[in-house]
């Protein structure tokens, strides 16, 4: 068996960074760059009733998070080839669903379709590949990484002329530019939303922020089944749905949560996060982007990882395992970091 050539990690990282910068920017202004990007995938793929669709995969499993333009009164179905997997409702109205497919063939493209309870198509079929088996020897693996794609709609009219966050249309174009390089997977490294509930500067330190007052959350209540549910969707939805749409339907995504995903800035005193904001973070994940699928070498009993009829999904610990070529461990520590003399980032069970 031929040996793989030795790869110097420093040279690899330096070369990768240079190639990424040249490929993405080439010295061009942002507006000129985005104007050259191809027609959005959603314009050549019939999304039907689908508002947004984000998948993740392992070698034998697929997990989808999907929202629809209207509530569905009965559970839709995900068809993977000739097999069917029922949807599970993630909200209380029937607009947000998840689909979990198991025991799939590894390393092959699968034909997927979403159908309503009456058998009608909810969108055009598409393909999504599972990862190669752990003993496979793939020749290449390309990973797209980015961070801080959230934020309410802003305005951009040219270099030095940005107000607030970038418009969601430009964020979407940048991500589609990344997708044009054909990544095998994508890591969204936190800050998918910016809607901090407290102020952490000046005389208002610790007081409710203007955005918190706008949302008018009931901090003593549950997220789902109350006005809190609608307030969450009004705050988070416009920061996620138009940025991703269904453009990542054929690219597995891995979403880590950072400080702003817990509806707070990581200023001193803000963490460990308050119970209600922790529930908001969990609910946002439940609605919009997939948790991490099981992996045989991941220890059981990690924080925010559970055994259920969906297997050992984790909200905070993930693995990208691409044959024997790439293994990427993903750890989210925002929920376990503490302050004080005995402060830690990782829960003792993780240590």
What positions do the PLM features span?
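N-terminal secretory signal peptides and thylakoid transit peptides that target proteins
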Residues: 2-20
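Metal-dependent phosphoester/phosphodiester hydrolase catalytic core
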Residues: 9, 14, 37-351
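Sec-dependent, cleavable N-terminal signal peptides
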Residues: 18, 23-24, 29
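Signal peptide processing junction and immediate N-terminal pro/mature segment
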Residues: 28-38
